[in-house]
């Protein structure tokens, strides 16, 4: 799969021990913030994302800073939809806003790069809803399948992913791209963490 090969070749999928936003320790890390450095695969990923959401009824896109903003921006331009973004915490200067958009009365597509437990996504949903918007769906490039879909479901928000981590890792586990030791660490993590 070109996407997965590109992730590995460009060091966007890293193998090791990484602390995630959720606090979990993972034997792999997806650094999709840099995917836009590789236009061809980035553009292909955006096209696949658009294909996944083409039947969703929304009128504004909100990207989660920072990983979701490049994807949200390209999708917004290609689909002709207004764009805003949301931070996970106040910046402490300027207007000190968390949400940079007028979402009142709008149906929102929330966009991020990766979903793990759904903590950041659900926080964004709460903020957008409190500002009068309604998140109708959330799009991520990769769902790590560690609870985000269930968490968003509690808010009535559907999680849509371009890729599931299971398909990415299964490809890796059946390839010669990583060592046997790394394969074993990933298998162990999958058993313990993937829904």
Swiss-Prot record:
EC number(s) recorded for this UniProt protein: 2.4.2.10
Quaternary state and interactors: Homodimer.
Pathway(s) annotated for this protein in UniProt: Pyrimidine metabolism; UMP biosynthesis via de novo pathway; UMP from orotate: step 1/2
Role according to the record: Catalyzes the transfer of a ribosyl phosphate group from 5-phosphoribose 1-diphosphate to orotate, leading to the formation of orotidine monophosphate (OMP).
Name listed for the protein in its UniProt record: Orotate phosphoribosyltransferase
Cofactors required: Mg(2+)
Annotated positions binding 5-phospho-alpha-D-ribose 1-diphosphate: 87, 91, 112-120
Organism: Sulfurisphaera tokodaii (strain DSM 16993 / JCM 10545 / NBRC 100140 / 7) (Sulfolobus tokodaii)
InterPro entries reported in the protein's UniProt record: OPRT, Or_phspho_trans_dom, PRibTrfase_dom, PRTase-like
Chain sites annotated for binding orotate: 116, 144
